[in-house]
A protein has these predicted regions:
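Intrinsically disordered, low-complexity non-transmembrane regions of multi-pass membrane transporters
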Residues: 2-34, 228-243, 278-282, 292
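N-terminal signal-anchor module of multipass membrane proteins
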Residues: 13-94, 102-110
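Membrane-embedded helical hairpins/re-entrant loop segments and their flanking transmembrane helices
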Residues: 28, 54-92, 257-329
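Generic transmembrane alpha-helix signature in multi-pass membrane proteins
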Residues: 50-54, 104-112, 138, 162-169, ...
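Flexible hinge motifs at transmembrane-helix junctions and intramembrane kinks/re-entrant loops
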Residues: 61-66, 177, 181, 191-239, ...
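Transmembrane helix-bundle signature of multi-pass membrane transporters/permeases
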Residues: 69-72, 76, 97-99, 123-127, ...
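Membrane-embedded alpha-helical modules
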Residues: 110-226, 332-342
Length: 342
């Protein structure tokens, strides 16, 4: 796609259309349709970390549900902070936030030795550390010339391939992982996305991923592969209780390990920010990067208070922006609202 944006007014495709900018405000129905597309693209990755942590800590199902609820709620808050911005916090770019997988190993080790309260104590301190060092770390942006940026964008796509393959197989841990049914449904969904993207016009073409997800899920349900019984039995409304597992405790070895995780997150965020900046034609300089990293820090701190985890940009949504060509940060802000409501 390069830097050529793909956006439709009526049935006419336009390149670099002035209404398709990072600050474009789309009609409300389009905002939430495109926003839902982003949520569905990141949902499985968003809930994976709380599931892994809960299993490692042998938490009951009730606590797992609380972790997932808190995670999605904080994902929404973090996304709104990043997309809308408040003062010098938030990059004001279409960057959806989710829990970083880099934190899984350290959190499970901290939890096994010191319990959940030590996990959240380490997360809170690491978030505060990230917020404070953001302006200093952002100076490293000069180490990211175009050749490095291009390499980062390529690596983002390559690193997402195993994720796509695992999901097509049915998800790691699924007893039917790799079955012909799962793989066939995955390819069928992929073909639907490609067909809609290639042959549909206007608004529908931009929603190719969402249409593919809905069609694939409907086919899976008709085949008896998708089961929504647990959804029907679950509570429709849940409230987030800060410090549900108790007031945070602070083990400094645990804090140090989480700070190291956040250093990795800052590098990852730098690459994702530059990639998004290239896609949406908004150059990311030192000032902008510092704002993005501050948002990661404050979101991680909030996560520690609300029983969630460290936050970073989700790379699969970077790819989705490139595929759909819809640059508006308000689309991703709508995703944040949807995540809060979930």
């Amino acid at each position: 796609m390069g830097n050529i944006s793909r956006f439709y007014v009526g049935d006419t495709m336009t390149d670099q259309n002035p209404i398709n900018t990072v600050d474009s405000m789309l009609p409300i129905p389009q905002l939430f349709a495109f926003g839902l597309q982003h949520v569905l693209a990141m949902y499985a990755g968003a809930v994976a970390v709380p599931i892994i942590v809960a299993q490692a800590m042998n938490l009951p199902v009730e606590d797992l549900i609380r972790l997932i609820t808190a995670d999605l709620f904080t994902c929404g808050i973090a996304t709104l902070i990043q997309t809308l911005g408040f003062g010098n916090i938030g990059g004001r770019i279409p960057m959806i936030q989710g829990v970083t997988f880099a934190s899984v190993g350290p959190m499970t080790m901290i939890g096994a030795q010191h319990g959940m309260t030590a996990i959240y104590g380490a997360i809170i301190v690491a978030g505060l550390f990230t917020f404070i060092v953001a302006p200093f770390f952002s100076r490293l942006i000069r180490l990211f010339p175009p050749v490095v940026t291009g390499t980062i964008i390529t690596l983002i796509g390559i690193n997402l391939m195993p994720v796509a393959i695992n999901w097509m197989g049915g998800g790691v841990g699924n007893p039917e992982f790799g079955s012909y049914t799962n793989i066939g449904l995955g390819f069928l969904t992929f073909l639907i996305v490609v067909f809609v993207y290639k042959f549909a016009k206007g608004f529908l073409s931009n929603l190719s991923v969402l249409i593919g997800l809905i069609a694939g899920t409907a086919i899976a349900f008709a085949m008896g592969v998708a089961n929504f019984d647990e959804v029907g039995r679950s509570q429709w409304v849940a409230f987030i209780e800060p410090f549900y597992f108790g007031l945070p405790s602070f083990d400094w070895a645990s804090v140090l390990s989480m700070i190291i995780v956040m250093l990795v997150v800052m590098v990852e965020t730098t690459g994702d920010s530059i990639a998004i900046g290239e896609i949406v034609d908004k150059p990311i300089g030192r000032k902008e990067l510092a704002s993005v990293i501050r948002a990661d820090g404050i979101s991680t701190l909030i996560g520690g208070i609300l029983n969630s985890f460290p936050y970073t940009a989700f790379a699969q949504n970077v790819g989705l922006i490139a595929v759909t060509g819809v640059k508006s940060r308000f689309v991703v802000a709508a995703s944040g609202v949807i995540l809060i409501l979930l």
